[in-house]
Amino acid sequence: MVSQDEVRVFHTVDDVRESIDQLSDDSFFTYGWFKTLESFGMLPDPLYLTASYEGSTIAIAPCFIDKINDFFSWGPNIIPFLHRLLNVSQRLGLYKNNVLLCYSPACCRTKILFDKNYNDTSVLSLLSKKIDNICKEQKVLFSSFLFVSEFDELLMKNLEHLNYMKFPNIVTFYLDLSWSNFDDYLNSLKPGMRKKIRREIKKCSDNGVTIKEEHITENIADKLSELEAIVSSKYDPTSNNKLPSSFFLTLQKYAKDKIRLFVARKNDEVIGFSLLLQHKELLDVYMYGSDYTAQTNTFFTYFNLAYYKPIQLAIDEKIKKIYFRYLNEKVRLDRGCRPEQTYSFIKCHNVLLQPSMNTLLKNSLYSKLRSRFLPDYFKK
């Protein structure tokens, strides 16, 4: 039986390097990913909660104090002016204006990594108590499991019993792979879509575009940074968060063979790329970059980089699942993907406020008013 004394907190992924990759089945919950984020200050206050039994790590809950305000970009809007209220609370010295988050940045997934022999409610309860203690010691008013999958039975069934409130969050998409070759995959789709995909692959080639897998090197890292910024600015013109070339080199350094990079070239010039992360039997299409001036819509570079090449790779290497993130619902469903609903679980850590907060959030009238007048942060 695991005791509370065997639940520890580490502040760098270096301290859980071996166990995290062993327990994880997800590329965004690995040493290489978290080490890259820590190196760039993109995970400013990490907390790796571990549960041990007889000297072995049996569970890890990656969390962090949200100093980058991810909650107020991706979470549910539970009460009016929450961010302002937390800012006032911090100025008065009552509570910090940050939320403790359990999730891995950039992947829209929350996971607790368990040894398969200890995936039970007692370990989850101990980790939850440790979160309670951290929030009390550091004066953090709210914690959140930000993106819990509808398929995560342990978290879905038990977090509410641990005084977390549940709210729907974004819908992501995934593809389960059971085909022996790409033609079998195409044959699983509707006839019109099969024809369309074959045409898009042929058109890409006919336009002189070649797509090959490459390693991240100094020669190409600058181009990855440039093309990623072009795509980011297209969808968010106010964004100034350009990833430097050193980010890609650092990711290659720490993630190593977990990096899968497809590069599209025309006349030997890089015009696009897709960056994937792989761990064990899971592949995640993480990033896409493009030079829109060097191609037209008839090149179909995006679909080849973001869908067809990753699917072909996964089939060839017997990978079981690909994550494709959120948005573009019709595009993803037409290509065989399935939706995966995520939920945010939120807890107030003030013993006086928690009962009234839970009562308010469960009130049907308030829920209707909230859904009408308080758009969730991720919908803005």
Regions found by a protein language model. Name each.
Residues M1-K380:
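N-acyltransferase acceptor-side catalytic subdomain
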